[in-house]
């Protein structure tokens, strides 16, 4: 049974809604300069990146296109399965394009490393922007080109991040209480 008030499942707020909006504005200004005159393909990684992508592109003041991919290394639970699966490929031709991958979080790095290598192999110039970077969780070597917040190695939900498909709609990023997932 789901709780009626999602906030009750949160141990603490790591990044507030106001901080996310402010950081999205800052990143948008940087990305506007980076991609001025280039018409980048802003590639959201479904499903978690949707809130961040929606907030971020409002602050990028240049022509851009958007598309989406679904790649997963989580199959429920709180730990990565280690296996990266391409579930939905990009519809747009990527050869010769500037691509900005938008991700909600970089944890183990497996998903982003896989995606970056796949798109570069297809002839794209790829950069990565992530709302959250969790370097303590890294298993493979990959660094985002642009990052909103560096966070500790805790299981977080909200602003697109989920636990068993719940909590994505929280307007902030918070640490989920262990009793929620240690049942």
Swiss-Prot record:
The lineage of its organism: Bacteria, Bacillati, Bacillota, Bacilli, Lactobacillales. Belongs to the purine/pyrimidine phosphoribosyltransferase family. CDD domains: PRTases_typeI. It is found in: Cytoplasm. GO terms for cellular component: cytosol. It holds the Pfam family Pribosyltran. Purine salvage pathway enzyme that catalyzes the transfer of the ribosyl-5-phosphate group from 5-phospho-alpha-D-ribose 1-diphosphate (PRPP) to the N9 position of the 6-oxopurines hypoxanthine and guanine to form the corresponding ribonucleotides IMP (inosine 5'-monophosphate) and GMP (guanosine 5'-monophosphate), with the release of PPi. The gene is hpt. GMP binds at residues 134, 155-156, 162. GO terms for biological process: GMP salvage; guanine salvage; hypoxanthine metabolic process; IMP salvage; purine ribonucleoside salvage. Mg(2+) binds at residues 103-104. This is Hypoxanthine-guanine phosphoribosyltransferase.
